[in-house]
Amino acid sequence: MGFLIALLVLSILIFFHELGHFVAARFFGVRVEVFSIGFGKRLYTKTINDTQWSISAIPLGGYVRMKGQDDSDPTKVSYDSDSYTVKTPWQKIIILLAGPFANFLMAFILYFAISQLGVPRLEPIIGDVSKDSPAYQARLQKDDKIISINNHSIKYWYQIGKSINDSPYDIIRFEIARENSLLIKDIKPKIVNEKNIFGESIDRKIIGISAQYKPTSQTYGFIDGFEYAFDETLKASTMIFKSIQKMISGDVGADKIGGIITIVDVTAKASQSGLLALFFFTALISVNLGVLNLLPIPALDGGHIMFNLYELITGKKASDDVMYYLTMFGWVLLLGLMALGIFNDINRILH
């Protein structure tokens, strides 16, 4: 069941991406010849308003084929008025951006839905105090509940670390609820050097406490939900861009690249963990698709945007030979990355 849900999620994300291209193309009067979910043999086809809507055998992607556009050979053109070819560079760029934009919009919608359903949080209750830590020396105890930090109300555990690290003061004031008493504790955090998820050294202020597992949820109002959704979409996009940058620079190894097997497996597990977990992971995949499609690789939207930006800036098109060979290189690179991802997936399964 989880596997089928994973395929359904991927199909929905691909449909949304291609729908973005479709809507923008039709807005500018471009005829869309084919709208396909999946590749390979077409299992189902229905023609509506001159567009063949298809479901194909291999559900690992999808495509919109516009009149006058051929990703496998960009030199194949049509000069009819309803052709992609005759549109101006800025119109083509908008059509190309519409796909990734649709993915970011889908992630935003999912994060907004999460904000209304209730974001999983932990209550600000101490589960453990590290020996000889600043919290230990201040005599904080297990089951203490942190009410405020520097007179700012604390409702959830995640706010504690942020408040400590954002504080401009050397000494931080904690208001603690213990049994039926309210206590004030002034604590000087210690600074530790740690590695983040990208292997970078960062300084972090800590007082030496860990959370007690007391789950709760944080529900946002309508306007605050929009802000939460925007922030989460932006954070996910930034993280993925930075991950790609670290892979290119060699700071993150190629063995960390995951393929379709990992995506399906993790999505299936997320679906078994509940609706919120599925929404979180689906939003992350959607942002991932949006970011990856913006990379300046000729086989992707970003590559086509690059060609059109060149034409917009210089006033002339890239030569047919340059476009053809760069596109072929892009496909080889893309297929190579997909193969590497699948290899890493299989390697992880075997080990």
Give the residues covered by each predicted segment.
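Conserved PDZ fold ligand-binding element
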Residues: 135-157, 233, 326
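PDZ-domain C-terminal substructure recognizer with occasional recognition of PDZ-binding tails
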Residues: 141, 147-148, 162-203
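Membrane-embedded helix-turn/re-entrant segments that form the catalytic/gating core
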Residues: 26-107, 210-211, 217-220, 225, ...
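Functional transmembrane alpha-helices
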Residues: 79-83, 87-90, 194-291, 305-329, ...
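Alpha-helical transmembrane signal-anchor/signal-peptide segments
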Residues: 28-33, 118-136, 141
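Hydrophobic transmembrane alpha-helical segments that form the core helix bundle
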Residues: 85-128, 231, 290, 299-300
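Active-site His/Glu-centered metal-binding helix of metallohydrolases
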Residues: 19-24, 101, 105, 295, ...
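Divalent metal-coordination and catalytic microenvironments
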Residues: 17, 55, 99, 293, ...
